[in-house]
């Protein structure tokens, strides 16, 4: 028999509140949290995976607030770009991708070359070497012979003088596959500027198109020459690899280019130099080239070029399903996490759904939040308590454990989680008076790990599990299974007796007797 539901149902997200070993560096176990511990002792609870493959990230990668809220709100694993592309390589769909295959075939049909340009490192922030190697495989499968790599050097997400090793790896891969050669190298300072320093982008573009730059007979020679001038990877000036005194390859009419960076912000300027018709940031040698240019992901909606992996459109996310049931909902957070309970929770959609109200509580104006660990948690609490009776569903975020956790100040993090616990107590009491259900969870870990093994401050997120507590007297005897963030939305719908849409692949955490 279905359990009657009193309104509102509240989903409370404690940002950066993970489950870690008790110890001196764990602000959560060190803090006085009587309300949180009382809920753990008295109500059904479980643990959720909030990092790595469970939230669409590479295995072992820590979670974050954007990804956490995206998965919670979507009710399914939302694969991030890096993971989506790597998954496509594994399942083979990469090699039938229309945009990528189209670029390779266009080069073949026009008697042109394929140019693969992007960041060559294993930093995993902007690009991935596996994606470059898969593009080489695709070109070989399609029978293309002339394939050239334009290697942008990192030195930021990896050590500052590590490029030689990555270039050797790429050259080894080219030899093993029997396809591809490095034609230019340059630091990301030039090729990946995002601050409208167009003179930098111009130097990168002219090296790629006109062969302008330092000359070297091999990538290793170019790197050596740069290091001798005390210029490390990020700042390596554009260098052109030559054969018999001429550039090995430049981008020409009839060629195809694939920009294999998956992160958008630092790929936009160079892309615009290639594809924009009314480009006026600098003079392009020979004007706009007639080439096939493909972006690996969508760098900007206004860029006129094919995209191999366009943004995912998430249908039937939790907010949409709640709206479709005719229910009123509230999203409330302070400034630091407002986008997370709105844009990210709604699957990357800016517009509210019908019946969805949003309330932003300003975050305090301090340089760092260890100066005010309470942040605006009490103000968020005051505001939500005033509005409990106006809504059917409320999503609330407390930012403190994450934002104060990032400062590395253990005492401040303890004060932060103690403030949140005080607020939990006030909200739980008000919800209990209404016999309304409260679901308490987190998006990723942070405050439970404030010390490195050597005693230094730890300021990053963690890969730890996060709590999930079902606070409702009618479910006191219920059992909950372990799961992942994708299972939160189906649990909300289960309690509200709303049909779970097929697009949600998560499952309710409530074990059916």
Curated annotation (Swiss-Prot):
Q: Which SUPFAM superfamilies match?
A: 2,3-Bisphosphoglycerate-independent phosphoglycerate mutase, substrate-binding domain, Alkaline phosphatase-like
A single GO cellular-component term from the record reads:
cytosol
Q: What class of enzyme is it?
A: isomerase
GO MF terms listed in the record are:
manganese ion binding; phosphoglycerate mutase activity
Name a Pfam family for this protein.
Metalloenzyme
A single GO BP: glucose catabolic process
> What pathway does the UniProt record associate with this protein?
Carbohydrate degradation; glycolysis; pyruvate from D-glyceraldehyde 3-phosphate: step 3/5
Query: What residues bind Mn(2+) 2, as annotated?
Result: 15, 65, 443-444
**Cofactors demanded by this protein:** Mn(2+)
Cite the binding residues for substrate.
126, 156-157, 188, 194, 263-266, 337
Highest taxon of the lineage: Bacteria
Per the UniProt entry, the Enzyme Commission number(s) are: 5.4.2.12
* Entry keywords, A to Z: Glycolysis, Isomerase, Manganese, Metal-binding
Q: Is Phosphoprotein among this UniProt entry's keywords?
A: no
Q: How is the cofactor bound?
A: Binds 2 manganese ions per subunit.
Q: Which residues bind Mn(2+) 1?
A: 402, 406, 461
Q: Which InterPro entries match?
A: Alkaline_phosphatase_core_sf, BPG-indep_PGM_N, Metalloenzyme, PGAM_B_sf, Pgm_bpd_ind
Reaction catalysed by this chain? (2R)-2-phosphoglycerate = (2R)-3-phosphoglycerate
Which residues constitute the catalytic centre? 65 (phosphoserine intermediate)
- Quote the function comment for this protein: Catalyzes the interconversion of 2-phosphoglycerate and 3-phosphoglycerate.
Kindly state the subunit structure of this protein: Monomer.
Family label: Belongs to the BPG-independent phosphoglycerate mutase family.
Protein name, per record: 2,3-bisphosphoglycerate-independent phosphoglycerate mutase
Protein species of origin: Moorella thermoacetica (strain ATCC 39073 / JCM 9320)
């Amino acid at each position: 028999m279905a359990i009657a539901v009193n309104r509102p149902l509240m989903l409370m997200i404690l940002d950066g509140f993970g489950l870690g070993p008790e110890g001196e560096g764990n602000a959560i176990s060190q803090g006085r949290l009587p309300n949180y511990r009382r809920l753990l002792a008295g109500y059904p609870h479980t643990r959720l995976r909030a990092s790595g493959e469970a939230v669409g990230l590479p295995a072992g990668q820590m979670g974050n607030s954007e990804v956490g809220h995206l998965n919670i709100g979507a009710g399914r694993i939302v694969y991030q770009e890096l993971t989506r592309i790597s998954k496509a390589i594994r399942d083979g769909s990469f090699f039938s991708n229309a945009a990528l295959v189209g670029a390779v075939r266009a080069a073949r049909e026009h008697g042109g070359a394929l140019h693969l340009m992007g960041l060559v490192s294993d930093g995993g922030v902007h690009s991935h070497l596996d994606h470059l190697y898969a593009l080489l495989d695709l070109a070989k499968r399609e029978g293309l012979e002339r394939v050239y790599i334009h290697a942008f050097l990192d030195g930021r997400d990896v050590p500052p003088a590590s490029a030689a090793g990555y270039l050797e790896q790429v050259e080894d891969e080219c030899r093993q596959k029997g396809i591809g050669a490095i034609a230019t190298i340059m630091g990301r300072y030039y090729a990946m500027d995002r601050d409208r320093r167009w003179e930098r982008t111009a130097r990168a573009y002219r090296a790629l198109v006109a062969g302008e730059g330092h000359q070297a007979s091999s990538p290793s020679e170019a790197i050596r020459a740069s290091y001798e001038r005390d210029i490390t990877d990020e700042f390596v000036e554009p260098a052109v690899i030559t054969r018999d005194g001429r550039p090995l390859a430049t981008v020409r009419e009839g060629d195809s280019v694939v920009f294999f960076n998956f992160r958008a912000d630092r790929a936009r300027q160079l892309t615009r130099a290639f594809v924009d018709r009314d480009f006026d940031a600098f003079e392009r040698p020979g004007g706009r080239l007639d080439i096939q240019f493909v972006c690996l992901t969508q760098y900007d909606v206004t860029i006129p070029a094919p995209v191999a992996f366009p943004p995912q459109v998430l249908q039937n996310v939790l907010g949409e399903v709640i709206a479709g049931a005719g229910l009123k909902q509230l999203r409330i957070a302070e400034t630091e996490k407002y986008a997370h309970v709105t844009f990210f929770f709604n699957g990357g959609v800016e517009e509210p759904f019908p019946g969805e109200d949003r309330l932003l509580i300003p975050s305090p104006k301090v340089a760092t939040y260890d100066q005010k660990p309470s942040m605006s948690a009490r103000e968020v609490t005051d505001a939500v308590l005033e509005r409990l009776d106006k809504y059917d569903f409320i999503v609330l975020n407390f930012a403190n454990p994450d934002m104060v956790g990032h400062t590395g100040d253990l005492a401040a993090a303890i004060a932060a989680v103690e403030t949140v616990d005080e607020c939990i107590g006030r909200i739980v009491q008000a919800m209990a008076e209404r016999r309304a259900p409260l679901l308490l969870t987190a998006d990723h870990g942070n405050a439970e790990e404030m010390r490195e093994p050597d005693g230094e401050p730890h300021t990053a997120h963690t890969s730890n599990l996060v709590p999930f507590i079902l606070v409702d007297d009618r479910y006191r005897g219920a059992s909950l299974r372990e799961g992942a963030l994708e299972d939160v939305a189906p649990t909300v719908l289960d309690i509200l007796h709303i049909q779970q849409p097929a697009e949600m692949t998560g499952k309710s955490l409530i074990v059916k007797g």
